[in-house]
């Protein structure tokens, strides 16, 4: 069971992403005009480090070495009128096999390497990585993507208690 709660007007969850870099490029997969990181929801009771290894295996079909935790993010955003509040763990990951041309999940999305210096030219999801990833040197960076003014104005009254 995924570690998430879904209501009528909101979605809350805990997820992981694999930040795979080679030769100053970031591995993503393309969904329409957006580029996403490999990752997904943590299962209830699952450690985040194990979750990212599982997601890499499920989506790419290769084993990996989960290295260091790079970012811990509290990310709140509105997507199609639904409030999303996600706690996210982004790990630096080294793949122990070849990258397939497409993901293995139902979508079979095309894998794409993006030059770190050109991230701003792409619609990377999550969007804050376009800004944060080129600045990262070492250690864990905590990021709070809040929109308190937007939340107070547009969403607070919609949440059912």
Predicted regions and their residues:
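Acidic, metal-coordinating catalytic segment for phosphate/diphosphate chemistry
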Residues: 1-17
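Nudix hydrolase/Nudix homology domain
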Residues: 31-35, 106-161
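Thr-Gly-centered strand-to-loop micro-motif
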Residues: 37-39
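Unchanged
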Residues: 42-65, 76-127, 161
